[in-house]
């Protein structure tokens, strides 16, 4: 089966992206399917803003060509809810569904998923996209509730992408040896941004410090 999958560059030297990592993981672990990567999204060193318009026009033409060359391919469209994506991706998705293509939209969070205030024009775009008769994939039940209740999405499937934290409930203070030479090591791997859980990480570290757990944060 041919599957067209969108994401930024899969080369980590050109782009540090959670979507790229997820896409590479999907392709690498699903060898029975023929994935066709369509690169969409700027590289880390590319200029943004108005400088992107000529490149986007070129990409839109390439998108039409890609769909024409693979008429039977289904589409796995990765969709972060950021301002650049909200202004770009609906055009690409609209072309695909107007052509009657089978498509699943994989939502990857983003600033405007949980933002208390969304500019009116972006909110209208989001409600328009999620109002389409398309299947949407999200990464948690909380995100599913947000899409259905706030944006009116009807066909949403949750595929959690985090580790099972049930064992954390069994963690008890007396089981931890307060050995300053062997503090608890906390690792963070990802982009340093407010919407990547920085506030939650800070609160967790403050709580550990207050309860006198020795720890070391590695970023």
Residue ranges of each PLM-predicted region?
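N-terminal subdomain of nucleotide-sugar transferases
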Residues: 1-44, 70, 206
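Donor nucleotide-sugar binding/catalytic pocket of nucleotide-sugar-dependent glycosyltransferases
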Residues: 126-171
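Nucleotide-sugar-dependent glycosyltransferase donor-binding/catalytic pocket residues
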Residues: 11-15, 164, 191-194, 207-213
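A short, basic/aromatic alpha-helical/loop segment that forms part
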Residues: 13, 83, 168, 193-198
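A short, histidine- and acid-enriched strand-loop-helix "catalytic/donor-clamping" loop
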Residues: 80-84, 101-120, 135
């Amino acid at each position: 089966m041919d599957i067209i999958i969108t994401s930024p560059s899969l080369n980590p030297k050109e782009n540090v992206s959670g979507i790229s990592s997820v896409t590479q993981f999907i392709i690498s672990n699903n060898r029975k399917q023929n994935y066709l990567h369509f690169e969409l999204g700027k590289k880390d060193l590319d200029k943004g803003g108005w400088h992107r318009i000529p490149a986007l026009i070129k990409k839109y033409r390439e998108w039409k060509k890609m769909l024409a060359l693979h008429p039977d391919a289904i589409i796995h469209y990765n969709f972060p809810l950021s301002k650049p994506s909200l202004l770009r991706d609906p055009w690409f998705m609209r072309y695909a569904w107007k052509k009657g293509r089978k498509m699943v939209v994989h939502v990857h969070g983003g600033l405007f998923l949980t933002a208390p205030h969304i500019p009116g024009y972006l909110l209208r775009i989001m409600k328009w996209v999620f109002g389409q008769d398309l299947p949407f994939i999200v990464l948690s039940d909380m995100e599913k509730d947000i899409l259905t209740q706030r944006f009116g999405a009807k066909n949403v499937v949750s595929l959690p992408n985090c580790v099972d934290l049930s064992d954390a409930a069994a963690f008890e203070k007396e089981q931890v040896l307060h050995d300053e030479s062997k503090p608890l090591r906390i690792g963070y791997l990802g982009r340093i941004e407010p919407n990547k859980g920085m506030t939650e990480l800070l609160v967790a570290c403050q709580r550990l410090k207050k309860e006198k757990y020795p720890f070391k944060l590695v970023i």
